[in-house]
Amino acid sequence: MIRLFLSLMMAMFATAVEANEINGPAKAVDSTVIEINGQRVMLFGIDSVMRKQNCTLGGKIWQCLAAAVRELEILVDQGPATCEMMGEPDVYGRLLARCTINSQSLNEQLVRRGYAVARPSETTDYVAAEAAARDEKVGLWRGQFMMPEKFRQAAGIFVERP
């Protein structure tokens, strides 16, 4: 019975991978990483603050990473996610994907709400959403923060994308 169950589960996952898509309830793991059916998925075309990165609001340090993760939790709680893979998994097994929830782009919503920034080196799809969030001073844009890519460079942190 266990073998049958495992075989069925592997067949379902293989079908999803072959179709370049993964579906199911999502859980926020980090500010731009979700987990679906045990598979970690990095959101394509966007970037966000990192651990040890300070943000300020009204001259005081605030927990911007926790706020970004919480916003992603709110978004993924709205329904199951469908993610279209954008290449092979990285060295940690994470997929890079465009995801939707209720037919809305999760990637774009996180940027539009100001808790992620566009990553134009991957796609320009989210540049307008970032500009709108910045202009409206929502999310991270309410205060000051270093762009995540610049923070990683300054801190000597290398994050490989698939």
Where are these regions (language model features)?
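Sec-dependent signal peptide recognition
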Residues: 1-8
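Small beta-barrel nucleic-acid-binding modules, primarily SNase/OB-fold domains
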Residues: 5, 16-162
